[in-house]
A protein has these predicted regions:
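Mobile beta-alpha loop/short-helix "lid" or hinge segments that flank ligand
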Residues: 156-164, 168, 205
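Short, flexible loop segments at boundaries between secondary-structure elements
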Residues: 145-161
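Short connector loops/turns at beta-strand edges and beta->alpha or beta->beta junctions
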Residues: 81-84, 160-161, 169-171
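Active-site glycine-rich loop that binds ribose-phosphate moieties when present
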Residues: 141-150, 170-196
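Contiguous, glycine/small-aliphatic-enriched amphipathic segments in soluble metabolic enzymes
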Residues: 1-139, 182-210
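Active-site-proximal beta-alpha loop/turn segments in soluble metabolic enzymes
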Residues: 124, 167-176, 208-210
Length: 210
């Protein structure tokens, strides 16, 4: 069976995302299930490989169809958008926020064009996004805007339990204004359809109150 092609933006260059990527690509578990296309900055990825000590070879590509399915090979689309002279690990910066956004945007562009089957994200820093004047607060809002999806769903899954969020990234006052009967009914219907797409045909849905 042909493996799906997954785009993975490296997240905030100053954070742990690039190291997570290096460790994931080096793992047998990830290699067995997908062909991964990393979107990031080569200099940052090389540092992540050095820090983690993983035995990885970078295969720099321009398009996902150039990716190779070989153990120990990290397929990379290099956006070359980090200035190492001003870069610092663990620091909030507009440069890193802008870079992180560009990695996500490029990954979504590939998905929208049908060049990859899905996008798997890594950690970003909301303060850095703000410093870069990115007009979105996080992943969900970026995906919603760049896929032209109004009111996108967010779902977490842990130990077989799936959690959807009626509100996110808003103040308590805004949250209270958003919790309306019609919105809840609409959300339950949308969540049910989303679960069906994931293969969940039957189950029990609990709705948490305030």
């Amino acid at each position: 069976m042909k493996k799906p092609v997954i785009a993975i933006p490296i997240g905030d260059p100053a954070g742990v995302g690039p190291e997570i990527v290096a460790k994931s690509i080096a793992s047998d578990e990830v290699f067995q299930i997908a062909v991964c296309v990393i979107v990031g900055d080569r200099k940052i990825v090389e540092k992540a490989i050095e820090i983690t000590g993983e035995n990885l070879k970078i295969n720099e590509i321009k398009e996902p169809d150039e990716a190779v399915d070989e153990k120990g090979v990290l397929n990379l689309i290099d956006l070359d958008n980090v200035d190492m002279d001003t870069f610092a690990y663990g620091k909030v910066s507009g440069m890193c926020g802008k870079a992180a956004y560009e990695y996500i945007a490029k990954s979504i562009e590939l998905a929208n064009a049908g060049q990859v089957d899905a996008v798997a994200t890594t950690p970003i820093n909301k303060e850095s996004l703000h410093a870069a004047e990115v007009p979105y607060i996080g992943h969900t809002e970026i995906f919603g805007a760049l896929t032209h999806t109004e009111d996108p769903l967010t779902m977490f899954e842990t130990n077989g339990m799936r959690v959807f969020f009626l509100t996110r990234h808003v103040s308590l006052r805004q949250m209270l204004d958003m919790i309306k009967k019609d919105r809840i009914i609409d959300y339950v219907k949308r969540c049910t359809k989303a679960l069906e797409r994931l293969g969940v045909k039957e189950g029990t849905m609990a709705i948490a109150g305030l």
